[in-house]
Amino acid sequence: MSVAQEGRRSGRLPFSRRALLVLPALVAGGAGLGFFAMLRGLGTGGYDPRGVPSALIGKAPPDFELPPLEGIGLPGLSAADLKAPGRPVLVNFFASWCVPCVIEHPQLMRLSREGVPVFGVNYKDQPADGRRFLERHGNPYARLGVDLPGRTAIDWGLYGVPETYLIDRGGVIRWRMAGPVTEDTLRADLGPLLRRYA
């Protein structure tokens, strides 16, 4: 008598079928525990999205071409603008609905006033909302592309907004900041890197 026939007779499923029934529950339980651990880390400060590495560091930006934000009078943004800019530039992904984007905006305005080219990507935002955001908070951007569907953000490996990248004079991504650029970030990280890659 085969194992399957014996299992049918005894009312028990053979091992392979039991495993198929139990395996999804184990996978779901493991994923749930991992998610709970991440949420717990968020509450205690143990989980930091800035610690998520970028696969793009040391590489050229991915190929992309974004249309301009209408009504602002700036050109759009493409990978060609970053191939060899001749000086360090920042690429900043932002959205009008993003509270941390408002927090970091004064730092971007400061960098722009100091002569650092800041290129913007308006991420998953309605054009009218993006325009209102810049009218309200100021416009630090020398170029500004619209990524309404979010495809370019996916290609860049965007974790969320705001997210800022430093591109060196030769067109290589040297630094990434997931989260708002703050005064501390400028002093400790970005400022020294801008001087290094100038």
Regions found by a protein language model. Name each.
Residues 92-97, 123:
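Aromatic-flanked redox-active Cys/Sec active sites in thiol-based oxidoreductases
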Residues 1-68:
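N-terminal targeting signals for export/organelle localization
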Residues 102-138, 147-154:
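Structural microenvironment flanking redox-active thiols in thiol-disulfide oxidoreductases
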Residues 96-103, 163:
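C-type cytochrome heme c attachment motif
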Residues 136-140, 148-194:
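Thiol/disulfide oxidoreductase modules built on the thioredoxin-like
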Residues 65-89:
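A short beta-strand-turn-helix
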Residues 90-91, 118:
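Hydrophobic beta-strand anchors of alpha/beta hydrolase catalytic cores
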Residues 62, 89, 161-162:
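Short loop/turn microsegments at loop-to-beta-strand junctions
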